[in-house]
Amino acid sequence: MPHIELSLSVGDGESAMATCRQWEAPVRASADACLLLDASGAIFATSPSCRAMLGLPDGIDEHRRGLVDGAVRLISFSAGGGVLPRWDAERIPPLQALNTGALARGLLRVSSSGVPRTLDAISTPLHGGTEIAGSLTFFRRC
C-alpha cells in the first residue's frame, strides 16, 4: 500500500516577502548607502544616502521599479560613458548576488544629474526559506 505524507508550511514566496519586510526598516533608517532588492530585482527599500548617491527620488521604494529598468542610469567605464547595455547591467553586484546566490563585489558607474560617479558595491543574497528572497547592497563612492 502506498504511503503519503503531507507537510504544510509557509510557501517560499511568502517567506521571501517576509524576509524583505524584515530588512525594510533597517535599510530605510541606515546612515550607510544601502539598497534592498526583492527576488525579481525590484527596488524594495533604500537609505537616504543611497537615494542621493544613485540619484533616486524619494518614494522610489513604493513603486517597486526594477533597478535596471531605468530607475538608475548605469553608464559604462568607456571614455564616452555611454549607457550600459542591459546584458552588462545585469552583471552589477546587486543583481549578480540574486542570480548566483553568492556574495558579489564590483565597481559600477552611475550618472545622476549628468554627473558620473564610480561606486564600489558589495552585495549579499538574502534567503527566505529555500529561495533567494532578495539582495542587500552597500555602496561607497570611489
Task: Identify the residue ranges that each predicted region occupies.
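A short local loop/turn or secondary-structure capping micro-motif enriched for an aromatic residue
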Residues: 53-55, 126-129
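PAS-family sensory domains
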Residues: 2-9, 23-25, 30-100, 130-142
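Short, intrinsically disordered/low-complexity patches at protein termini
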Residues: 60, 68-69, 128-130, 141-142
